[in-house]
């Protein structure tokens, strides 16, 4: 069986559904496929998002996918003294929501469908269809049969492993151990957490990573940890670190776990090349996860919108060359690469700092008004209060 579309999107996470939504809106016959039977499940996310980027992708908050609206974030150093306070007044980027990720993902897919995109679930891509050096579709298992889905443009949104991108011929990047974060999260009830703030804890409690607490409502929260795998002795280390943190904090130690989530996150540099003739990769597949925060929803959805724009241009001009695809790479790199690269270098350095140095950094930043977590502004503040740290941090300057 063969079907034909203008655009085939592989993967119905936020990036893929965003690409399908905007492609369909532009009048392109669009198919969005998802390998799992249930979009958004299983949840593999801390579920915290800021709100500053939402207007760019025309996303309006909906009560059914919001668990809690927060006023800001608090970042604690190892001693857990005065935290960095990120609020609407001094860092509006950190004001946002704790979401129900499965409902959020379904909502974005529903927006794509409402614009006219077809959606297939339990429909994995099995292989690439090529015409010469151009990607022209995929073989897909759908309703127990193999379907040749032919498309003028293919958008891969299949996560940081991006099997489809590898099958198509994109160079498979072997991630360094410093560029992979192993994560464990408990959804907990009967906890004492502040519903107005997301909390982050730095230091040896989570080597080269952090612990997060995202409130999900009254006495309920996601309590999780991400640890760079280069700091792990064995696969149980991450859970052990999280359990030790919870045990040492009475507000959480009396809580009950009702869900366990595990997974991994890539915190690498952006791919050098993430397109081929007829193929664009978006979101995690293009390695657009922020290296400092590990967050990828915003970057993914914005890149999905960009991919739809370039797909429309390519189809209108019947030009599927690498030169046309490079327009998408330029848009993505212009938007994300400078900050992304800076944050990658910062991540590399911050992972080497002692608890004592991290405490001094938090102490400095807690007294400085900043608009975002900016390496440049942090260093300026450090130079004023702890000049002896400048040499240690010189690789960030």
UniProtKB/Swiss-Prot annotation:
Binds 1 FAD per subunit. Keywords: FAD, Flavoprotein, Lipid biosynthesis, Lipid metabolism, NAD, NADP, Oxidoreductase, Phospholipid biosynthesis, Phospholipid metabolism. It catalyses: 2,3-bis-O-(phytanyl)-sn-glycerol 1-phosphate + 8 NADP(+) = 2,3-bis-O-(geranylgeranyl)-sn-glycerol 1-phosphate + 8 NADPH + 8 H(+); 2,3-bis-O-(phytanyl)-sn-glycerol 1-phosphate + 8 NAD(+) = 2,3-bis-O-(geranylgeranyl)-sn-glycerol 1-phosphate + 8 NADH + 8 H(+); a 2,3-bis-O-phytanyl-sn-glycerol 1-phospholipid + 8 A = a 2,3-bis-O-(geranylgeranyl)-sn-glycerol 1-phospholipid + 8 AH2; CDP-2,3-bis-O-(geranylgeranyl)-sn-glycerol + 8 AH2 = CDP-2,3-bis-O-(phytanyl)-sn-glycerol + 8 A. FAD binds at residues 15, 34, 45-46, 48, 101, 125, 163, 284, 296-297. Pfam families: FAD_oxidored, GGR_cat. The keyword Iron does not apply. One of its GO terms (biological process) is glycerophospholipid biosynthetic process. Gene3D superfamilies: D-Amino Acid Oxidase, subunit A, domain 2, FAD/NAD(P)-binding domain. It is an enzyme of class 1 (oxidoreductase). GO terms for cellular component: membrane. Is involved in the reduction of 2,3-digeranylgeranylglycerophospholipids (unsaturated archaeols) into 2,3-diphytanylglycerophospholipids (saturated archaeols) in the biosynthesis of archaeal membrane lipids. Catalyzes the formation of archaetidic acid (2,3-di-O-phytanyl-sn-glyceryl phosphate) from 2,3-di-O-geranylgeranylglyceryl phosphate (DGGGP) via the hydrogenation of each double bond of the isoprenoid chains. Belongs to the geranylgeranyl reductase family. DGGGPL reductase subfamily. This is Digeranylgeranylglycerophospholipid reductase. It comes from Picrophilus torridus (strain ATCC 700027 / DSM 9790 / JCM 10055 / NBRC 100828 / KAW 2/3). The lineage of its organism: Archaea, Methanobacteriati, Thermoplasmatota, Thermoplasmata, Thermoplasmatales.
